[in-house]
Design a protein with these regions (language model features):
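N-terminal intrinsically disordered, acidic low-complexity segments at the extreme N-terminus
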Residues: 1-8
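A residue-level detector for the "anchor" residue at the start of short, highly conserved motifs
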Residues: 8-74, 78-95, 101-254
């Protein structure tokens, strides 16, 4: 027997360039999967960041929290809240994203709600905070509240509203408190908002995603009112009243 055939030839592994290419592809796929988990496409499902919050609500879900004798919170849909360490006896939370109505019922240290780059403080008050984009909106519904951003502060009386973002704290304005409060009664009311704003709001309460592709239609200002539980009926209203064409796709995409 030929000695050269005593042992089968050893198999050679993939070349270094091929191995590096494989590892690079695997790492890219892993990174892509992680990105999808953190930022789901079209927000079709909750992200991993949603599950890190102390308190959260899903799509169309609302929740009430009694965090202390002096702090009661009602959370709206798609909202995340974290508890923060108390400062000198204060009850403190952070609105990470979404919308919440806060009732402060203490006579001592204030309730503090952090949101974005600012904070809202109150002792005896009821106020609404909305943080669904780059801007935070604070509306005072009862009592008075202090809204602070960097070194600036605005004191709001009942019926006043102020917004702030990364650029600064803006001047207070008169608020439509009925519209601000509407979500607590299960309705959504629009009076002169653009159709794009209406669709954004529908997406907060409806599973799936509504995509508005017509720029002229998106800029059109509308007046409408509908129940939170009837978002599909709202889409039919947009079709019948404003000429929107609806195309339904799997996964609740319209």
């Amino acid at each position: 027997r030929d000695p050269g055939l005593a042992h089968p030839p050893a198999r050679r592994g993939p070349s270094r360039p091929a191995r590096r290419a494989f590892l690079g592809t695997a790492m890219a796929m892993a990174a892509g999967g992680a990105a999808v988990a953190v930022w789901p496409p079209l927000s079709l499902w909750p992200s991993l960041l949603d599950y890190t919050a102390d308190f959260r609500t899903g799509t169309a879900e609302q929740r009430e929290l009694a965090l202390s004798d002096q702090l009661h919170v009602q959370m709206n849909t798609q909202t995340r809240i974290n508890q923060r360490g108390a400062q000198a006896g204060s009850a403190a939370i952070e609105l990470v994203a979404g919308e919440a109505q806060v009732e402060a019922a203490g006579s001592g240290a204030p309730v503090i709600v952090y949101a974005g780059a600012g904070a809202t403080r109150a002792r005896q008050a009821r106020f609404n905070l909305r943080y669904t984009g780059p801007e935070v909106c604070v509306t005072c519904l009862q009592g008075t509240v202090d809204v602070q951003w960097a070194g600036a502060q605005r004191t709001l009386a009942e019926g006043e509203q102020v917004t702030y973002d990364d650029t600064g704290l803006h001047a207070p304005l008169a608020a439509d408190t009925a519209q601000v409060n509407a979500w607590r009664t299960g309705t959504l009311t629009f009076a002169g908002q653009t159709l794009a704003e209406v669709v954004d709001e529908i997406n907060r309460y409806r599973p799936g995603r509504v995509l508005l592709r017509n720029a002229d239609l998106a800029a059109r200002r509308v007046r409408m009112r509908f129940e939170i539980t009837q978002t599909d009926l709202a889409l039919h209203m947009l079709r019948d009243l404003y000429g929107a064409q609806l195309t339904r796709l799997p996964g609740g995409i319209v």
